[in-house]
Swiss-Prot record:
The lineage of its organism: Bacteria, Pseudomonadati, Spirochaetota, Spirochaetia, Spirochaetales. PANTHER family: 50S RIBOSOMAL PROTEIN L9 (PTHR21368). HAMAP family: Ribosomal_bL9 (MF_00503). This is Large ribosomal subunit protein bL9. The gene is rplI. Belongs to the bacterial ribosomal protein bL9 family. GO terms for molecular function: rRNA binding; structural constituent of ribosome.
Length: 156
């Protein structure tokens, strides 16, 4: 069944996109939540009128994502974790840990958008973490994991 999306739907698409979905998915999930409408000549005409507004919102999102990318890549993330003498962490650094640290730095990033190489980081060192911002815009953020005891002695 062909539909037109009223709002951005994760995995499926963005507002104004024409998609082919199962009739049951449309009938039971998308339509009751007003996320999509059936594709017919009336809805197509309505979306042609709104197309300029939709494109303007998308361009603003792209611009905001590009600005956020520049700010994220310019500022390295430093995480202090307890580690043994061999540099192996007692815990692990996950996407949740990185998202929390970014929130402390003033960046609002969802945990789901943070991609940690190998899902977890378990050793002290320098890494690069990818953050998916919008469409194809991704920020590669340098992350430094330090031993917490060394970080405490440096701050004193």
């Amino acid at each position: 069944m062909k539909i037109i999306l009223n709002q951005d739907v994760k995995i499926l698409g963005e507002e104004g996109d024409v998609k082919e979905v199962a009739a049951g998915y449309f009938r039971n999930y998308l339509y009751p939540r007003n996320l999509a409408v059936p594709h017919n000549r009336f809805t197509v005409a309505r979306f042609k009128q709104r197309q300029q507004d939709i494109e303007m919102r998308k361009s603003l999102k792209r611009q905001d994502a590009a600005n956020l990318k520049a700010r994220l890549e310019a500022q390295p993330v430093v995480i202090a974790m307890p580690a043994g003498t061999n540099g192996k962490l007692y815990g692990a650094v996950t996407s949740h840990t990185v998202a929390e640290q970014l929130a402390c730095m003033g960046f609002e990033v969802e945990r789901k958008r943070v991609e940690v190489p190998g899902l977890t980081l378990k050793c002290v060192g320098n890494y690069h973490v990818t953050i998916r911002l919008y469409e194809e815009i991704c920020a590669v953020v340098p992350v430094t994991i330090k031993n917490q005891s060394e970080a405490d002695s440096v701050s004193e």
